[in-house]
């Protein structure tokens, strides 16, 4: 009921009555009117969580506060992980989600976070982007050609036909994954990160199935590069040292997963949402 009130009139709603974890709020896409209202209030608000074991959480909605939180890792640590654990499907004997995520860079605080970030930061500088320009142009042309073959009238779906594939093929190639695996990588990352979206996942058991399929794929790539390094980003991570030590095999696996999700899902969302905003 609280969410319905916000949908009807977010401009006059009380921010303390909003539960941003209520899936109904997101049913028709991001609730931009609600976001604007929250930013105009210039405050933090406490979510009315339906998950008592989690105790609710704070939403930070304006730039100044977000910047302050980002600079203060002692007060706002990332070690607890970034997920609402109770929202994940549970299976007997399944690994603890927090334990898994704590092998990822985004669940680390400085100074280790900064050292892990430095391992890959050089691969995403403007200079490196220029060096990849021709390969990215080749990928974009390939994706557009395929989209036009699928839609001879020239009316393509920007998300399904373009946004799904360009970021996945670019980051996949940087990591050393074959281009032909792009669709499978998109499917795995969708199912493991969008487990509450009924358009992506209809059966929660399918989330764990995706993990069981994805991890052996990554494990094979990492194992191969441990003995036969190439010039891709996965090899660089495998053979890098942080604090004088190599990353563990599990840390490398989760690094690959993180980069694949960030380079695929996050980039796709920014690209397609940005295009929609420009068109609107």
Predicted features and spans:
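Cytochrome P450
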Residues: 2-280
């Amino acid at each position: 009921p609280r969410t319905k009130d916000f949908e009807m009139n977010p401009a006059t709603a009380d921010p303390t009555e909003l539960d941003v974890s209520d899936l109904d709020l997101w049913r028709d896409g991001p609730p931009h009117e609600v976001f604007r209202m929250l930013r105009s209030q210039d405050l933090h608000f406490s979510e009315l969580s339906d998950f008592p074991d989690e105790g609710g959480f704070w939403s930070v909605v304006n730039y100044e506060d977000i910047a302050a939180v980002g600079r203060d890792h002692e007060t706002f640590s990332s070690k607890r992980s970034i997920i609402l654990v109770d929202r994940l499907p549970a299976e007997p004997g399944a690994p603890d989600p927090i334990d898994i995520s704590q092998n990822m860079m985004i669940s680390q605080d400085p100074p280790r976070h900064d050292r892990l970030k430095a391992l890959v930061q050089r691969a995403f500088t403007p200079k490196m982007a220029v060096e990849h320009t021709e390969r990215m142009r080749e990928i974009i042309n390939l994706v557009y050609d395929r989209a036009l073959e699928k839609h001879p009238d020239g009316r393509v779906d920007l998300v399904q036909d373009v946004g799904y594939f360009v970021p996945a093929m670019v980051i996949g190639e940087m990591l050393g994954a074959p281009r032909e695996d792009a669709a499978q990588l998109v499917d795995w990352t969708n199912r493991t990160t969008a487990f509450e979206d009924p358009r992506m996942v209809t059966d929660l058991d399918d989330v764990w199935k995706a993990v069981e399929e994805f991890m052996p794929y990554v494990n094979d790539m990492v194992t191969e590069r441990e003995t036969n390094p190439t010039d891709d980003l996965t090899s660089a991570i495998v053979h890098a040292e942080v604090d004088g030590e190599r990353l563990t095999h599990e840390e490398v696996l989760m690094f690959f997963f993180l980069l694949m999700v960030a380079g695929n899902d996050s980039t796709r969302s920014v690209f397609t949402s940005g295009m929609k905003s420009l068109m609107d």
